[in-house]
């Protein structure tokens, strides 16, 4: 079944509201990417306006910036430690923007959106 992102068919009182237009293609959405940690898998999708998005469904490496000396390194992610988007994402190893992951060089906070851009960037935290 498709994901419809239009307005509700019910009023705040619970009564059914009468629609003055049909469902449009522009109101349909997609399932979330839910990027996991593992061997790299990327998928290209066509978005609105014939724009393309690269979805990382599985990612293994992260570009980490060290704020002390402003250097960047491409390192491997080990596991998800914390995710503010959903507490169940931690045990499923799903990464989103703002998640804290364990890397080879320490903890890093994800600053990019892997489900939208297909790349994982982060900042090293203490």
Swiss-Prot record:
Top-rank lineage group of the source organism: Archaea
A molecular-function term among this protein's GO annotations: structural constituent of ribosome
Alphabetical UniProt keywords: Ribonucleoprotein, Ribosomal protein
Positions with biased composition (Polar residues): 1-10
GO annotation, biological process: translation
A Gene Ontology term for the protein's cellular component: ribosome
Chain intervals for the UniProt region annotation (Disordered): 1-35
Pfam families with a match to the protein in the record: Ribosomal_S8e (PF01201)
Quaternary structure, from the entry: Part of the 30S ribosomal subunit.
Family: Belongs to the eukaryotic ribosomal protein eS8 family.
Entry protein name: Small ribosomal subunit protein eS8
């Amino acid at each position: 079944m498709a994901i419809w992102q239009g307005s509700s068919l019910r009023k705040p009182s619970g009564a059914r509201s009468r629609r003055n237009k049909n469902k449009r293609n522009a109101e349909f959405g997609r399932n979330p990417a839910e990027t996991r940690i593992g061997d790299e898998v990327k998928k290209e999708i066509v978005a609105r306006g014939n724009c393309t998005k690269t979805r990382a469904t599985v990612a293994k490496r992260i570009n980490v910036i060290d704020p002390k000396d402003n250097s960047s390194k491409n390192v491997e992610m080990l596991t998800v430690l914390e995710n503010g988007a959903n507490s169940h994402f931690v045990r499923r190893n799903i990464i989103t923007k703002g998640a804290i992951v364990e890397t080879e060089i320490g903890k890093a906070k994800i600053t990019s959106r892997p489900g939208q851009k297909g790349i994982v960037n982060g900042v090293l935290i203490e």
